[in-house]
């Protein structure tokens, strides 16, 4: 802009090819088997909520009971959890768009209301070892793999549960703009780029 350099040194450079992981999505039958097995393992509420919202793993595990209004079904997503050298850290989500309010289906709110009676922690999904801290991302990842294997489902990453939610939402007629807001994407273009 100030013409300090006569030519752009980046002109002619080739960008590396986009390397994206193959997106995996659970089919409807797999989803049913998965949720039945998750219930048997004591993780039904965690995985049901994720499959109904498409939350990122760190967002899901950072949820506290104060984030859910049982009267309206409004769930506030305003923090995330991640691990640094074995220590859990809580921070704000990755973008401003990631801070959002979702309205849960009444059936999910009722499942969470009943589950709440069994949990003695401010965290929605506390550690099974220490109730005053949330369950760790690594523990949930390992549990996911166990449940998938026992349910006879294909092996997927936790993030693929988010893809499953998005794919099923689009198949059921949700518009891209609404889905984009639910997923916490900065723009609908991001959602379109991933899911079309």
Features from the language model and the residues they span:
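Short, P/G- and charge-enriched loop/turn segments at secondary-structure junctions
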Residues: 88-93
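Active-site/catalytic core of tyrosine-dependent DNA strand-transfer enzymes
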Residues: 25-29, 72, 79-86, 105-154
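Catalytic-site neighborhood detector that most strongly recognizes the C-terminal catalytic loop/helix
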Residues: 17, 25, 81, 183-196
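N-terminal core-binding DNA-recognition domain of tyrosine site-specific recombinases/integrases
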Residues: 1-9, 20, 131-139, 152-160
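Basic, Lys/Arg- and aromatic-enriched nucleic-acid-binding interface segment
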Residues: 5-65, 70-71, 82, 97-99, ...
């Amino acid at each position: 802009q100030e013409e300090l350099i006569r030519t752009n040194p980046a002109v002619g450079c080739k960008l590396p090819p986009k390397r994206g992981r193959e997106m995996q999505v659970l089919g409807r039958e797999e989803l049913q088997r998965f949720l039945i097995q998750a219930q048997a393992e004591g993780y039904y509420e965690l995985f049901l909520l994720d499959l109904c919202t498409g939350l990122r793993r760190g967002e899901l595990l950072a949820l506290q009971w104060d984030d859910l209004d049982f009267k309206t079904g409004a769930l506030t997503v305003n923090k995330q959890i991640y691990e640094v050298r074995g220590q859990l850290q809580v921070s704000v989500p990755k973008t401003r768009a990631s801070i959002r309010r979702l309205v849960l289906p009444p059936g999910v709110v009722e499942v969470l209301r009943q589950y709440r009676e069994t949990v003695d922690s401010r965290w929605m999904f506390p550690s099974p070892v220490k109730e005053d801290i949330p369950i760790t991302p690594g523990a949930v990842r390992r549990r996911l793999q166990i449940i998938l294997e026992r349910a006879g489902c294909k092996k997927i990453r936790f993030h693929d549960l988010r893809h499953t939610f998005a794919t099923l939402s689009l198949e059921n007629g949700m518009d891209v703009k609404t889905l984009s807001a639910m997923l916490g994407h900065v723009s609908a273009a991001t959602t379109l780029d991933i899911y079309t």
